[in-house]
Design a protein with these regions (language model features):
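Internal mixed beta-strand/loop scaffold within catalytic domains of large alpha/beta enzymes
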Residues: 54-130
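Gly/Pro-rich turn-and-neighbor structural signature
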Residues: 3-87
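Hydrophobic/aromatic-lined pockets within catalytic cores
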Residues: 23, 27-31, 108, 119-122, ...
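Compact, glycine/acidic-enriched structural inserts
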Residues: 124-169
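A short small-residue
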Residues: 1-3, 190-191
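A contiguous, surface-oriented mixed alpha/beta subdomain in the mid-to-C-terminal portion of proteins
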Residues: 163-191
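Short, well-ordered alpha-helical packing segments
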Residues: 12, 19, 23, 101, ...
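Glycine-rich, often proline-containing surface loops adjacent to acidic residues and nearby aromatics
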Residues: 96-98, 127-135, 185-191
Length: 191
């Protein structure tokens, strides 16, 4: 097995394991025993059904109005429109990507909504990408300011363990990614 194929297999398995752990932990907050419902899907382009797919996991409970923990592994040709815009795509015959997306909306107005996604992408190059943000109901409350400071301090600590000075680079990317141009504002407390 080629090294890149091993990386693909490991990352895809890791995302599935992570999804299972996140679902198990969130279900513990549901006092009436509500569980995630899972549904598989296929990426169907022009009726081929051979371009990967994933599994949606959705929980509607008493604690969480809606929580989604979704995984996917997709692949296929790179469109001419995207050739050269994605690292490694100029020479690649196609792409492969596997990832997880988590979106949680609690019922309590005191608990913010949270979004997180991460993925492993393979073209002529390969890398991990992703981001996270939180959105409280009242962005300007003193609790939201404390929450924003805590959230960003935790992210900074994680990033700095990975590579010194990387937090601000990644924060700027997330702030751009999570910007809502139609509202001319960042989503939530920034990424």
């Amino acid at each position: 097995m080629k090294k890149i194929d091993q990386k693909k297999k490991l990352s895809s398995e890791w995302f599935r394991e992570l999804r299972n752990k996140i679902c198990q932990e969130l279900e513990k907050f549901e006092v009436t025993g509500k569980k995630f419902r899972k549904k598989k899907w296929n990426r169907d382009v022009k009726g081929t059904n051979k371009l990967g797919g994933g599994e949606m996991s959705v929980l509607r409970g008493e604690t969480f109005e809606k929580a989604g923990v979704n995984i996917s592994t997709v692949f296929g040709p790179i469109s001419q429109e995207l050739k050269g815009k994605i690292p490694g795509s100029k020479t690649a015959k196609g792409f492969w990507a596997s990832g997880i997306s988590v979106v949680i909306h609690p019922y309590s107005p005191k608990i913010p909504a949270i979004h997180m996604n991460t993925r492993f992408i393979v073209t002529g190059k390969n890398w991990f990408g992703g981001g996270t943000d939180i959105t409280p109901n009242n962005l300007n409350s003193s609790n939201s300011i404390k929450l924003a400071n805590y959230f960003h301090n935790e992210l900074k600590e994680i990033c700095e363990k990975y590579k010194k000075g990387s937090y601000y680079k990644y924060k700027n990317w997330c702030d751009e990614y999570f910007f809502l141009p139609h509202r001319n504002e960042p989503r939530g407390l920034g990424g």
